[in-house]
Amino acid sequence: MNNILITSAGRRVSLVRFFQKELKSVFAEAKVFTTDANPDYASACRISDGYFKMQRVTEPNYIDDLLQLAIKNDVKIIVPTIDTELLILSKNIEVFKSKGIEVVISDYEIMKIFRDKRLTHQFFEKYGINCAKEYSKENYQLPIYIKPYDGSRSVDNFIITTQEQLTDYHFQNDKLLFLEYLDHKKHTEFTIDLYYDKNSDLKCFVPRQRIEVRDGEVNKAVTKDAFFIPEIWKKMQHIDGFRGCITFQVFVNLDTQQIFGIEINPRFGGGYPLSY
């Protein structure tokens, strides 16, 4: 049986339904299963073909338990959905592959890059994509944007426009980066869904203009045929180690049309239903 398992499904109802529709069009008897720490209260679990309570990814037996669950339920593909799963699952790709199970995820070395925004900026520079300037805490130019190099969901993010807004916390917290501020009034924000095959070749490209964001995740957006598609496609048409869905966030300057890379999340994003 060619079943699929979507981990940490949470509220991703549309994602589960899309996988059900596409999977059953090929394998009519196949099922889409889900896991969650609290599956009885996870809407995506309730509409899946079966769900399982799974310990948190930080628990020592997480990989072993997930592997046994997949084997027991004839799962051939695992689809992770949250940032905290990515490193450990990518590190264990071969463990699952040895049992005939594919984890839809990029290589471990790729995951390490995108868990650190400093390395992400280096990635952008390598592929000829502009990004916000990084300032030292001794030499910066207001306004600045402050965020942790390993953060997510907009936690500990600050827009600083005056010197008085800066505190000891900003200077003493080694995780906080001082960055050039890209004013939302002067830029349009896009998230691009990039889809890579097993050979790390780009197969599909869908840009979405972000209209409303909640806790760092898109809440409202519209799919658009953007002018920058050929440029980004050319620069990112093959990235060694990329597989599956990659969500790429960019700002586009309204006056100059200059593109700035903001961050990359190597997983299905919250706005995926607009790409489907």
Stretches found by the model and what they are:
Residues 108-188, 196-201, 226:
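Active-site nucleotide/adenylate-binding loops and adjacent lid/helix of ATP-dependent enzymes
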Residues 39, 150, 266:
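Short, glycine/acidic-enriched loop or turn micro-motifs at the edges of active sites
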Residues 40-42, 86, 109-113, 213:
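Short gly/pro/ser/thr-enriched loop/turn and capping motifs at secondary-structure boundaries
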Residues 154, 211-221, 265-275:
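Glycine-rich phosphate/pyrophosphate-binding beta-alpha loops
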